[in-house]
Amino acid sequence: MEIIKGWSDGGCRGNGKEENIGAYAFYLEYWVDNKLIHTKIDGDISYTTTNNVEELKGCIELLKAIKDKSIKLEVYLDSAYVLIGITQWINGWLKNGWKNSKKQDVANKELWLELLNEKNKFSDIEFIKVKGHSGEVGNEKVDEWLNAIMDTPF
């Protein structure tokens, strides 16, 4: 049996400030018959961004990195914003013309649409919540990579 497991993360140092630095990262594992076959880790840096934008970009880029959309995919997220947004809130936003529960425009609409588009390309996808900084190996790995990206001077 084939399965892909993926973790994504996003962060921003100076979130809410005019000048800040942020990044997203994702980590993928490809398993066949309970044997780890291949891994991939990637990410990128951004300036003048937010935590939520980077969390969304991490998940989007994770989904884009997978060529075979028919393989079962488990996406592990420590971001409740992305997890609840893509599994619950988005249905209401679509029905309500992209207004949130306070009747305000949904933030990051274009990224949500891109994430939904990428999600819908998969035949078997599950989003799973993990607690950040709790020792969960995949989450720790992607968090380390994310911080390394933000620490890099280029």
Regions found by a protein language model. Give the residues of each.
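RNase H-like nuclease fold core
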Residues: 1-57, 64-66, 143-154
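RNase H catalytic domain
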Residues: 11-17, 60-141, 145
